[in-house]
Amino acid sequence: MADSDNDSGGHKDGGNASTREQDRFLPIANVSRIMKKALPANAKISKDAKETVQECVSEFISFITGEASDKCQREKRKTINGDDLLWAMTTLGFEDYVEPLKVYLQKYREVEGEKTTTAGRQGDKEGGGGGGGAGSGSGGAPMYGGGMVTTMGHQFSHHFS
């Protein structure tokens, strides 16, 4: 695995990046995959473009999460939840994204609830208690196949699994 994009976070420093710096960035393969979904099939993305977006999205995540973390600390809570992130986005001026993300978060919570409920029923049928893992009754696939969020003219999709 020494040659994977993930070892240096795919960043310009290559093998010279500290472990702490590597942890700051999303894996370049994930960033590239997301970028490709927004482009025509024959489009090419330069390494520099991937690295730039990688750094930007990682910084954005840190920015939003930091604000949400500050809120949780003030409220003496240890766990950041989706609502905290939406609050942080509003506070930091990204309110145009909040309503579509609320829809997305609601769908996600519904799917997670279905997975938990179905896993519990599956465990009861087998005589076990609760059950975990993939037990949604359909090979681990959730009952809701995916979500589509449209924000400022851009559509974002996610398949919950």
Curated annotation (Swiss-Prot):
Pfam families from the UniProt entry: CBFD_NFYB_HMF
Annotated region Disordered: the residues are 1-23, 114-146
Spell out the residue ranges making up region: Subunit association domain (SAD).
53-64
Please give the chief subcellular localization of this protein.
nucleus
Gene Ontology biological process terms in this record: positive regulation of DNA-templated transcription; response to heat; response to water deprivation
Establish whether keyword tRNA processing is in the entry.
no
**DNA-binding region range list:** 26-32
Q: Which PANTHER family match?
A: CCAAT-BINDING TRANSCRIPTION FACTOR-RELATED, NUCLEAR TRANSCRIPTION FACTOR Y SUBUNIT BETA
Question: Tissue range of expression?
Answer: Ubiquitous. Expressed in seedlings, petioles, hypocotyls, reproductive organ tissues and leaves.
Quaternary data: Heterotrimeric transcription factor composed of three components, NF-YA, NF-YB and NF-YC. NF-YB and NF-YC must interact and dimerize for NF-YA association and DNA binding. Component of a heat stress-inducible transcriptional complex with NF-YA and NF-YB subunits made, at least, of NFYA2, NFYB3 and DPB3-1 in cooperation with DREB2A. Binds directly with DPB3-1.
UniProt keyword list: Acetylation, Activator, Cytoplasm, DNA-binding, Nucleus, Transcription, Transcription regulation
Entries under SUPFAM superfamilies matching the protein: Histone-fold
Question: What is the designated name of this protein?
Answer: Nuclear transcription factor Y subunit B-3
Of which family is this protein a member? Belongs to the NFYB/HAP3 subunit family.
Question: What are the recorded GO MF terms, alphabetically?
Answer: DNA-binding transcription activator activity, RNA polymerase II-specific; DNA-binding transcription factor activity; protein heterodimerization activity; sequence-specific DNA binding
Q: Does the keyword Acetylation apply?
A: yes
PTM annotation (N-acetylalanine): residues? A2
This entry's comment on induction and repression of expression is: Enhanced by heat stress but repressed by dehydration stress.
Q: Which GO terms describe its cellular component?
A: CCAAT-binding factor complex; cytosol; nucleus
